[in-house]
């Protein structure tokens, strides 16, 4: 079980933004093939009225650097119009994740599915041979995963776990193909009450850390939990 510890990050002033020609959020940063790759969400001016004052995200770019100063935009790596299960008027490709396993790169992303009676968010997977793509999306989202903000932890024994937010925080094992659940989702216990999102899990020195934004007394802070 995770025991919750909380930390509040003080106010910081952003300096030297690495992306200046487009609106981005929710970055996940990974070292692949000797370079740093940053996978953010991408906000655009809304083409539809209902999203004029909300997030409007239709695709993903990836950026890479070998010195953390000079960055290359590899362009669009995935667009909602190329994902078979995503609603064409969704514009909800929010916080993504990318991991490497079995010689492939797996890109996890949330969006809203098309189809009568479909509600809420699902999480899909796209696969590539290189960290900058091209990524090929699966025809359907991961069955049993309903939420946003995917995070995938590959443990030291090779077992992969997927975490996500939506009606609390959940986790499940992934099959070796990285495309299907190998266990039933469970709710992560021991976390503080209140709205939580954006989970990120990692291991260091034999301890597992689970970080997440948390709304505490109407202010969003960064919190973390630890487990064995």
Regions found by a protein language model. Name each.
Residues 1-15:
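Bacterial Sec-dependent N-terminal signal peptides
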Residues 14-228:
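Carbohydrate-active catalytic/glycan-binding domains of CAZyme proteins
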